[in-house]
Amino acid sequence: FKTLPNTKGKILVSDVSSCFLSEPMDISKYGIVYGGVQKNIGPAGMVISIIREDLITSDVLEGTPTMLTYKTHADAGSLYNTPNCYCIYMCGKVFKWLKAMGGLSAMKERQNCSTIFWMRASYSREPWFQRIAL
């Protein structure tokens, strides 16, 4: 969405796997934001979830496995299960790099420049060559 839909008071949940850390995002408008880290943040094998506190509750559907309740993980400090240490380490490296590069605003600007370049290249009738040093 270019703009968020009017949910008329319903909880907005979003899978942001494809756009995580590509631009600033107002997460206060969402109940749950989650995404796999494998595209923009780190190696496959981990999901980052941001869950509004009022949604972390013991009131779940009957039969929901313990492992699939937000409260289980929140109460355990996100360490209910063995953490994927390598993935956490690599994500940390990306977060530090991202901060050093200027944060999410800088990523949005880079994305805009990339879009302009690829649009120009797509609509050009001339071949485009880039010289590289060997």
Feature map (PLM): residue ranges:
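Glycine-rich, charged/polar anion/phosphate-binding loops
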Residues: 32-36, 75-78, 125-130
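A short alpha/beta connector and helix-capping loop motif
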Residues: 24-39
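Catalytic PLP-binding core of fold-type I/II PLP enzymes
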Residues: 1-28
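Conserved small-domain helix->loop->beta segment predominantly found in fold-type I
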Residues: 106, 117-134
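Active-site C-terminal subdomain of aminotransferase-like
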Residues: 37-112, 116
